[in-house]
């Protein structure tokens, strides 16, 4: 018994040290908050530069916490957002960078942040031009969207982005169903601004398809 106590103490200390060393999702919370502020409150003409500034901050988190999927996912989200804001060849180059980072996160943990890497990667495949300019691929996009929904079937983002994709593919009835499901998604603690902005996007898209169907 006397030999067992030191062993148990050593195991406890190892577990405690590992828990203290493991990075927390809270590390990326400031990135999440700032991203939502840029997307939903900043003028469109300023967003590319603001996303660029934010990407530098999230890269620092990734560098300081290697193999931490949430940081890689948010790096991919921010860089892909900058790509969309810039457009053109510069945006395409950024989209390729975002794709690489998101793929890295999936190799580490495909379930991190409820499969958010699948959602963001699917959106890139859906919106980036196809060959020879880019890597866009509608079939690949749908495969990834379905994986994102498998990981987070009731989430606001996977349902919104897949619904938007289906509407772009002229599968309006299917797309409407996913948009309506996205509106019913449970609020995300600490993501109030992002949820509010996303719901507005959903409602706008639903109104657009309602008008188009008349």
Language-model regions: role of each:
Residues 19-57:
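N-terminal leader/linker segments that initiate helical-solenoid repeat arrays
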Residues 31, 36-43, 81-90, 113, ...:
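Short coil/turn linking the two alpha-helices of tandem helical-hairpin repeats
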Residues 44-59, 91-100, 133-139, 179:
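Helix-turn-helix repeat elements of alpha-solenoid scaffolds
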Residues 56-63, 103-107, 143-150, 184:
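Conserved structural position within tetratricopeptide repeats
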Residues 66, 110-112, 153:
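Short coil turns that delineate tetratricopeptide repeat
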Residues 71, 114-117, 158, 192:
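TPR alpha-solenoid repeat register
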Residues 168-169, 176-180, 184-214:
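Terminal, low-structured helical/coil segments at or just beyond the last alpha-helical repeat
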């Amino acid at each position: 018994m006397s030999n067992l106590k030191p062993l148990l103490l050593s195991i406890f200390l190892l577990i405690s040290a590992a828990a203290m060393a493991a990075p927390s999702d809270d590390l990326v919370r400031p990135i999440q908050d700032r991203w939502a502020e840029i997307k939903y409150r900043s003028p469109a003409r300023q967003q590319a530069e603001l996303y660029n500034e934010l990407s530098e901050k999230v890269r620092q988190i990734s560098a300081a916490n290697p193999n931490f999927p949430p940081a890689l996912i948010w790096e991919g989200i921010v860089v892909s957002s900058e790509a969309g804001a810039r457009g053109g060849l510069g945006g395409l180059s950024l989209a390729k960078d975002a794709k690489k980072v998101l793929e890295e996160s999936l190799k580490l943990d495909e379930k991190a942040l409820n499969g958010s890497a699948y959602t963001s990667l699917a959106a890139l495949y859906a919106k980036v031009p196809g060959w020879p300019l880019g890597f866009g691929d509608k079939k690949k996009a749908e495969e990834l969207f379905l994986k994102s929904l498998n990981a987070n079937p009731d989430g606001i983002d996977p349902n919104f982005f897949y619904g938007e994709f289906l509407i772009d593919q002229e599968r309006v009835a299917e797309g409407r169903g996913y948009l309506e499901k996205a509106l019913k998604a449970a609020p995300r603690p600490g993501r109030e601004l992002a949820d509010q902005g996303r719901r507005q996007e959903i409602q706008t898209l639903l109104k657009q398809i309602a008008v188009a169907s008349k």
